[in-house]
Every structure is written in C-alpha cells, then in structure tokens.
Amino acid sequence: MSGETIEFFFSFRSPYSYLAAPRAFQLPENYEVDIRFRGVMPMAMRGQSVPSQKRIHTMFDTKREANRLGMPFGPVFDPIGDGAVRCLRVSELAVDQQLEKQFVLAASRAIWAEGVDVSSDEGLRPICIAAGLDWHACLQAISDPLIEARVEKNVEDLLELGQWGVPVFRFRDQLLWGQDRIEDLERLLDAAGLRR
C-alpha cells in the first residue's frame, strides 16, 4: 500500500467504465498509488433517466473508442437489474479479498465484449471462479445486507461529490469524469512526483 489513493467510481452498466478499467487498474504499476474501487448502481437504477439518443450515441462512441484502444466490444449484455446488483455485490467481496481488479476486468469484459448474462448463475459463476473467488462466498455476498449497504454508500459518496455519471476518478481534491480523463489523471500524478 502506498500513501496515495485514487478512488475509482465505476458502473458495470457503463461502457465507458469498461473502457477505463484496464488503464485505471494499471496506474499502480506506473505510480505510487492504490486504486480504491467504488462500484455504483447504474443511473437508470437510481431514478435518473437517460434519453434514448444518448444511449444510441454512447454505443457508437464506445465502439469507436474501443477500436482506438484495441479493446473488444460486442456482443453486449445489458446488466440492468439483477446483473448489475450481482456484479456490484460480488465486486465488494472481491475488494475484501484484493481481487477487485481480476473480477471487475473479467465481468466488464464478459458484459461488454462477450454478451454474457451476468444475471444468471451460469453466466456469473465462471467469471467469479476465473477471478479467484469462491462461488459459494459470492452467492452469500449477493444476498448480504452489509454488502448491499456498502454499494449504497458508494452511490451516496459519488452524489456528495456532485457527480452522477461514471467513471469518476478522485485524487486528492481533484475529480475527473470520463474514461478520456485518464491522461489528465496521469499528468496530476506526474506533477505530484508519484511516477515509479
């Protein structure tokens, strides 16, 4: 653990979170920082409407950005509802076991590049096992009210920061919103003298 932390607010339903995750989790390899993963419910599950034109634009833009970054995109499974809830709760278990990088990358790739139904045991189980998690512990986490409260706290903290969309990065007193802000974050880390 280093003395500096970057909070990474993420939604499994956000394609931009999917695009940001590999680069976000790579930051500790290049900088003296830790990533604190903060999974949040999708906007649509928090009562915030997303216009249909924005959804269409987002899918085209994400495909273009994925191509630019050399990341696979599609087929897609929309995890809204149980898929998002299950992934968020398992991700909290993964945080406890320091396996959040493995789980988040595997689950988001399954959702955004492999079309895996993460709302089903058949879809989620292999992802959890591949990430190094015990499946029975994952099932317990999915129904654990304490885990649910942690996810709710992540949402509350995001809103208290005056943010709603993701991904959001918080470093010291700086907030950066969007997968295209990782380079700005790296400049802040360089200016802070944190490059390895």
Label every PLM stretch briefly.
Residues 12, 16-114, 188, 196:
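Structural alpha/beta surface segment adjacent to cysteine/selenocysteine redox centers
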Residues 3-7, 13-33, 106-196:
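C-terminal cap of thioredoxin/glutaredoxin-like
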